[in-house]
Amino acid sequence: MKILAISDIHGKKSDKLIDYLKKEDISALLIAGDITDFQITEFEPLSFVKPFIDEIVEEADVDVFAIPGNCDPAGICNAIKESGPDEKPAFCMHNQLIAYENVVILGYGGSNPTPFNTPGEVDDDDIYLRVYELLAEYDYIGNTDAKRVTILLTHAPPYDTKADLLPDGTHVGSQGVKKPIHEFQPNINICGHIHEACSIDKVGQTIVANPGMLENGNAILIDIDEDAKFTVEIVEL
């Protein structure tokens, strides 16, 4: 099974994305936040969400799992849940977990505070509490005999990794994401937020992957076999 991850769309469609999804026979698309942007003035920001996701599902026949970013306005989760056809609706994974084939996806959107006063900012201590609770819930109820890949989907990247690195060398990620990754070691963390930080890194045994801004033309491809063995790579759309 192939899963593609993208992030930071900011209201800009990509024909290359749909072409790639169809060509590579992708089963699911993960969206790590900032589908739209509260600063958009040419159209109502939330009006972008449903047509964007509908086209992806209808053209490429993929399941869509998405979370809010810090730039997504209030109402983003409802907009995500109202997207996709009735037989294949999109899922808003904010503060949720779901089993999908031999994968468990756990999601938490928004970001730690930024200098820009964006609508989806969350105190880092609160991020830690929520992400910890999600991972602890799966750790408690999960069947350890089942071969599954755990994917933590966050908008904010874990602090002090390649995924949170600004061009000037400053790390601006979330300790609230990094600490529970250290404690529970999910297999993969897909994140976004830092547009220039397209990268693959590790926190302990957890692979941390940031696809960067969609407009830059990259994504993360996760390939999982029936024994839950997997690879993670950066791909060009």
Segments and roles (model prediction):
Residues K13-Y100:
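Core catalytic region of metal-dependent phosphoesterases/phosphodiesterases
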Residues M1-L4, L97-G107, D145-I151, K202-I207, ...:
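Beta-strand-turn-beta hairpins that frame and shape the catalytic cleft
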Residues D72-V172:
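Conserved catalytic scaffold of divalent metal-dependent phosphoesterases
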Residues A5-D8, L29-D34, V64-N70, F91-H94, ...:
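Active-site neighborhood of phospho(di)ester-bond hydrolases with catalytic His/Asp-centered motifs
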Residues V232-L237:
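Short, solvent-exposed aromatic-acidic interface loops
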Residues A5-G11, I40-P45, L165-G169, P186:
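Short, flexible loop segments at the rims of nucleotide/cofactor-binding pockets, characterized by
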Residues K22-E24, D54-D61, T144-A146, I181-F184, ...:
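Short, conserved loop/helix-junction motifs that constitute active-site signature segments
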Residues D160, L165-E226:
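Conserved beta-sheet core of the metallophosphoesterase superfamily
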